[in-house]
Amino acid sequence: LTRYDRVERIDLVEMDPQVIEACRAYLPGNACRMDDRRVHIYYENALKFIRKCEDEYDLIIVDSSDPFGPSEGLFTREFYGSCFNALRTDGIMVNQQGSPFYAEDATAMQRSHQRIASTFPISKVYQAHIPTFAAGYWLFGFASKKYHPINDMDAAAWNALNMRTRYYTSRLHVGAFYLPAFLEEMLRELLLALEK
């Protein structure tokens, strides 16, 4: 995110200072971005941090680990509700939801999506191919109070920004939300359960 001049502030919340130290030691090419003047690092539990925020963020990226142990709180209704409150009216939250090819991950994805969908008026799942992740196929959640990721996508406005990205394109954006039939079925069952 620090590559983009339009980004004014980044709050990085990490519970364990050793994670930041390890990144600086072993991933210096990426970790050097933490020294950017716009980056503010907070060493605390993200659930506690986000509880204190209201109408503050345009974007929340939840790059959590697995939904158990220290990160378990980042998969709760309380956390998603706090993220909802921390976002501005036009804010967006994205989060990792795992791989659908492993039973535990698929169950966690369903649970996470159900909790987000019960909190945000707009909640979608999108996909990406990430060779270094398990199965090389990963799911993410998109949640917003206002914007639908496809219906409100303005490709002309994005392209007019003339931002150089390594992966993202407006065409890929739309395609990422078109899921395989088995995933659509999993999510449809969840949404029907929410409506009851």
Q: Which residues does each PLM region occupy?
A:
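The AdoMet/dcAdoMet-binding core of the Class I SAM-like
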Residues: 1-90, 103-109
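Flexible, active-site-adjacent loop/turn segments at secondary-structure boundaries
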Residues: 25, 32, 72-73, 131, ...
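Short, solvent-exposed coil/turn elements at secondary-structure transition points
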Residues: 47, 99, 129-131, 146
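Short "lid" loop at the C-terminus of a central beta-strand within the Rossmann-like core
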Residues: 66-67, 98-102, 131-132
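Conserved Class I S-adenosyl-L-methionine
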Residues: 80-84, 106-129, 141
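Conserved beta-strand signature within the Rossmann-like core of class I S-adenosyl-L-methionine
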Residues: 90-97
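SAM/dcSAM-binding transferase cores
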Residues: 135-196
